[in-house]
């Protein structure tokens, strides 16, 4: 996380296997191995659809600023309009000037808007642009489930949780969608 790795540019924690090295496309250099992301769930109050839309606009802005502040080279706008590329260049320059910590801290502030104990919903509030609300009651005390050769703690109502994130999670996606979506390569360290 950001407390244990000075150059770590994200607000989520990761379990890293440092026998490997991750080399990222267009992200400032930091030491990372093969990893599993840990997405914390924070209180989300009793949010309405309009509150979710408003929050998602803030998150979208902050995510763009975070990603532009940590990229290692400029890429013109994909909209093929010179003025959009010019605007992106200046906004990216502002993001670089402010630095990733500034925007990561702003994103971190979003999680403190709602008291966890009095919230009906929980959501991952410190990363990504889309707020996915989950009923806090789905988690309860949790349950232990088998995952390969270990037991892990899972939500009490894991079915509702998985459906809200993945829809029909027991059905494989079409073959053409079964591809990696992150921009990095992994290498075994010597």
Positions of predicted regions on the chain:
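Conserved catalytic core of two-metal-ion nucleotidyltransferases
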Residues: 2-46, 56, 66-78, 83-167, ...
């Amino acid at each position: 996380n950001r407390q244990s790795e000075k150059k770590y540019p994200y607000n989520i924690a990761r379990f890293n296997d440092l026998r490997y090295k991750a080399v990222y496309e267009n992200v400032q250099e930091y030491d990372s191995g093969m990893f599993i992301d840990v997405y914390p769930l924070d209180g989300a109050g009793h949010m309405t659809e309009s509150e979710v839309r408003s929050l998602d606009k803030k998150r979208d802005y902050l995510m763009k600023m975070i990603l532009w502040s940590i990229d290692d080279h400029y890429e013109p706008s994909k909209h093929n309009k010179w003025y959009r590329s010019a605007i992106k260049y200046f906004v990216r320059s502002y993001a670089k000037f402010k630095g990733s910590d500034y925007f990561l801290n702003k994103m971190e502030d979003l999680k403190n808007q709602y008291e966890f104990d009095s919230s009906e919903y929980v959501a991952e509030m410190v990363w990504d642009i889309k707020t996915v609300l989950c009923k806090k009651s789905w988690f309860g005390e949790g349950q232990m489930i088998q995952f390969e050769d270990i037991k892990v703690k899972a939500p009490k109502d894991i079915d509702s949780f998985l459906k809200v994130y993945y829809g029909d999670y027991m059905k494989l996606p079409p073959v053409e969608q079964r591809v990696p979506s992150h921009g990095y390569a992994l290498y075994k360290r010597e």
